Amino acid sequence: MKYTSAATKPGVFPEHHQHAMMRNRYHPHHCNYSDNRSAIDIIAELGSESNAHGLAKIVTSRDTKRKVIWALLVIAGFTAATLQLSLLVRKYLQFQVVELSEIKDSMPVQYPSVSICNIEPISLRTIRRMYFNNESQNLITWLRFIQKFRFEQDSFMNSIRAFYENLGQDAKKLSHNLEDMLMHCRFNRELCHVSNFSTFFDGNYFNCFTFNSGQRLQMHATGPENGLSLIFSVEKDDPLPGTYGVYNFDNNILHSAGVRVVVHAPGSMPSPVDHGIDIPPGYSSSVGLKAILHTRLPYPYGNCTNDMLNGIKQYKYTFFACLQLCKQRLIIQRCGCKSSALPEVPSYNATFCGVIKDWQEINRNHSNEDHNQSEEDRAFIPTPYLACEEREQKNLNNDRTYELSCGCFQPCSETSYLKSVSLSYWPLEFYQLSAVERFFKQERQAGQNHFMKTAYEYLEKLAHPSQKHLARNDSHMDDILSKSYSLSEKEMAKEASDLIRQNMLRLNIYLEDLSVVEYRQLPAYGLADLFADIGGTLGLWMGISVLTIMELIELVIRLTGLVFNSEKGLPRGPTTVNNNNGSNNHSQSTSQHQLYNGYMDHDSHYSDSAGASVFDFRRGVESPV
């Protein structure tokens, strides 16, 4: 059968023009629609022009099967995108962090605070002076008291802490003074003095002294010559004949000579027991430092804090100090007393757990008892508060769950220092006389040291008259080298050297490197990463971009306007205005007729042996030719 071209019938279009006519139906340039069209028309129009994958296919496809297939594909893509987006949001809400290390060379380095304690808390020289001045009655009474009675915690009652808890200010009077200990001080090539130190009290070491507690000194050079150099006298005088202390085998930090040194962040609270290092006498100790800066993220990525230290305002906040104060509060709450091993909380008014109430009265009531009697025969004094403290201290040290209730977090910014310690024999015997002579004659406080006077007198007697000028004149070298010393002189020289090396030490604390290693926390998956992955997910599964979202916003705006117009009673759909007796209808029909004729003039004839049909847009049906 022969088919006739669709152009032979007016208003009938060939099949290859049908898709174009459907698109033109919803295109604003080809339809005379007003802004008050129906919601379906608006959705269809924007759907046919949408950049999202699949939506235009659903709207423009004439075949129902194609519409269903594309609809299923769009639903599948939407489901996959939703699942992946939920995983991305869950990953973001975990607020994980990564830690990066960076070496900074251009920033000034803060010099740390340096806290120094004499390892032997009590000055034997002070005890000697108080003894001869009859000022040590309480000390002697206490020593007799602990020997006369038996305690459940005998080890503690013989400790320096029990001595302080029961004698209070009398015990503090026996502690060391910086004026007696400090023989020489130099910082950054300039002299420093006692006034550059602040004093704090520790229950284990008594008086301790801090350099750079509030000055915030900055360093711009490395090496021992540009750091802090100190020469100390540890005041290791021989005890009175026949007087000896009690060695406490349960104490691992006392009963030795030297100083305990803590290098800590400027303005932070020192803890000599936990963070200190021992510096022995008779050596020159060098402590090299390298600054490390920790920068942490606050909530929600972390739990760092910028709060002040609760309870002790003169110190900066540190995690360790917060825990120590929390331990003290817990012991006070559970035992009704405080511990001298922990920092005091000013807001709590409590006595020490090791205090024996009315111990002096008890001692007087048992004055007739022999303090040399056997342990079994000694009277027993219970100490329930001390037992509670020891029990709680043990529990807190073995179980850290208490930290959850303390509310202690790491500071958001914190400086720490890596330490490397080295020792060398000091001072050499060859230079001892020159050093002692200067300290003895020029340094005011050095003249008060008994060992200094004795050592200087011994060495002065042994010195050759020309030995002091050996550096300038070697004409008497033969006399010096050929001189022989008697056994007593050699013993005198050895005793003088031993006195110097048993009492003196040199400490150098300096920066090894001006670069600061910063460990900085960064979000492992930030908001920018989330937005980037959301864009990639929507683009992969649905072809949606920001512009596509703008199209959706436009749809919402136009539908909202449609609702408002309908509430005002405005017509919806195509608008026809009758002016001059239907001239508008005539114009519309004329334009449609011209459009149909344009398609008919453009089309060609099609032929086929099976038959022919055309689509009549005026009736919306196919008609055979």
Curated annotation (Swiss-Prot):
PROSITE patterns: ASC
Topology within the bilayer: Multi-pass membrane protein
Tissue expression profile of the protein: Muscle and nervous tissue.
GO molecular function, one term: ligand-gated sodium channel activity
Residue spans, topological domain Cytoplasmic: 1-67, 558-625
Function recorded in the entry: FMRFamide-gated ionotropic receptor.
Pfam families assigned to the protein according to its UniProt record, in alphabetical order: ASC (PF00858)
Extracellular side: 90-536
Family classification: Belongs to the amiloride-sensitive sodium channel (TC 1.A.6) family.
Transmembrane segments: 68-89, 537-557
Subcellular location: Membrane
Record organism: Cornu aspersum
Record keywords: Glycoprotein, Ion channel, Ion transport, Membrane, Sodium, Sodium channel, Sodium transport, Transmembrane, Transmembrane helix, Transport
Sequence ranges of Low complexity compositional bias: 575-591
InterPro entries given in the database record: ENaC (IPR001873), ENaC_CS (IPR020903)
Protein origin, superkingdom: Eukaryota
Any GO CC annotation of this UniProt entry: plasma membrane
Protein name, entry field: FMRFamide-activated amiloride-sensitive sodium channel
Keyword NADP: no
